[in-house]
From Swiss-Prot:
Subunit relationships: Homotetramer.
Cellular component GO terms held in the UniProt record: cytosol
Gene it is expressed from: aroC
Keywords: Amino-acid biosynthesis, Aromatic amino acid biosynthesis, FAD, Flavoprotein, FMN, Lyase, NADP
Identification of the protein by name: Chorismate synthase
Similarity field: Belongs to the chorismate synthase family.
PROSITE patterns for the chain: CHORISMATE_SYNTHASE_1, CHORISMATE_SYNTHASE_3
Taxonomic superkingdom: Bacteria
Function of the molecule: This reaction introduces a second double bond into the aromatic ring system.
Xref: InterPro entries: Chorismate_synth, Chorismate_synth_AroC_sf, Chorismate_synthase_CS
SUPFAM superfamilies: Chorismate synthase, AroC (SSF103263)
The species this protein was found in: Allorhizobium ampelinum (strain ATCC BAA-846 / DSM 112012 / S4)
Length: 364
């Protein structure tokens, strides 16, 4: 199975399976001389790791990242990138492959089981292999490296919808995101989501969600017209996350409901002699090129396919079966997708940052 790499100058390859001994990433193209500590990477993995609340999978993984290459250790305990490939590894320590024995020959409705088997003639039924959300741990580690490439850029994500329950944007407070198990920026939605997900869990079911990622401090001029648009690459990386079914930038599909006067971001010259935008409906990107305004992306995540509810399906022999999935699964995988979305946006921006620096010499 190919297509495990993405990026041009900042290039990432992820490897490993949900129930293998380990998984990880190789980051190629990171500039030399960037100083960081292991904690600078671990903080992002700690946001994504399972078992932190009753609303996510109870699989227990410490998700401790190891840096195997591409750095020089320093006397103060930090590391400096050398410019060679950075290899990152995260060990799997809490697999229960026996939970999947009953579905070894059965296809879970809504899952990649059928299409993987159809295309390759083999699939890793133990947790889904590469189609598992577990694969995203490697992306988050790579995203930690990508952030090192982006001076002055802040990338933050939040959960804005679970099922039909949306946040009130008037209550948006970034300081609240790390104070609840949902990464919710609206503290008033937290008890609503708690009650709702408790019901979903008791039913043995799952539900979808929407994540919003905002990147601030992105320099104007990243991206290129037509086939190298910044929003094109951000969208592609967000769509590559397992379970993502839709992505929008700025107003996104909402732009189809308003007029040109309402949608256009008008401009004026600021007191400092620099142009300013009076709104940001475009989500920080025009013509595939960043404007300097915050980049805003949202993505929709489908409900987890592995649920306890009995459903109709077929097996690998073409027989009709009724299937119920055992094991430990996220009732709402969108919760842990927040740091994954941040990582994907970071990787896209790092790649375009280096491409712009190489092509125009504007950025240092």
């Amino acid at each position: 199975m190919s297509h495990n790499s993405f990026g041009h100058l900042f290039r990432v390859t992820t490897w490993g399976e949900s129930h293998g001994p380990a998984l990880g990433a190789v980051v190629d193209g990171c500039p030399p001389g960037l100083k960081f500590t292991l904690e600078d990477l671990q903080v992002w993995l700690d946001k994504r790791k399972p078992g932190q609340s009753r609303f996510v999978t109870q699989r227990r993984e410490d998700d401790l990242v190891k840096v195997l290459s591409g750095v020089m250790p320093q006397d103060d305990g930090s590391m400096i990138t050398t410019g060679t490939p950075i290899s990152l590894m995260i060990e799997n320590t809490d697999q229960r492959s026996k939970d999947y024995g009953e579905i070894a020959q059965q296809y879970r409705p809504g899952h990649a089981d059928y299409t993987y088997d159809l295309k390759y003639g083999i699939r890793d039924y133990r947790g889904g292999g590469r189609s598992s959300a577990r694969e995203t741990a490697a992306r988050v580690a790579a995203g930690g490296i990508a952030r090192l490439v982006l001076p002055g850029v802040t990338i933050r994500g939040a959960l804005v919808q679970i099922g039909t329950h949306k946040i009130d944007r008037a209550n948006w407070d970034w300081s609240e995101v790390d104070n609840n198990p949902f990464f919710a920026p609206d503290p008033k939605i937290v008890p609503v989501w708690e009650d709702y997900l408790d019901q979903i869990r008791k039913q043995g079911s799952s539900v979808g969600a929407v994540v919003e990622v905002v990147a601030e401090g992105v320099p104007a001029g990243l991206g290129a017209p037509i086939y190298a648009k910044l929003d094109q690459d951000i969208t592609a990386l967000l769509m590559s996350i397992n379970a993502v079914k839709g992505v929008e930038i700025g107003n996104g599909f909402g732009a189809a409901e308003i007029t040109g006067e309402e949608n256009a971001d008008q401009m004026r010259m600021g007191n400092d002699g620099q142009p300013i935008f009076l709104s940001n409906h475009a989500g920080g990107i025009l013509g595939g090129i960043s404007t300097g305004e915050p980049i805003v992306a949202r993505f929709a995540i489908k409900p987890t396919s592995s649920i306890l509810t009995e459903r109709q399906s077929i097996d690998s022999q073409g027989r009709n079966v009724d299937i119920r999935t055992k094991g430990r699964h996220d009732p709402c995988v969108g919760i842990r997708a927040v740091p994954v979305g941040e990582a994907m946006v970071a990787c896209a921006l790092a790649d375009h940052y280096l491409r712009d620096r190489g092509q125009t010499g504007r950025l240092k």
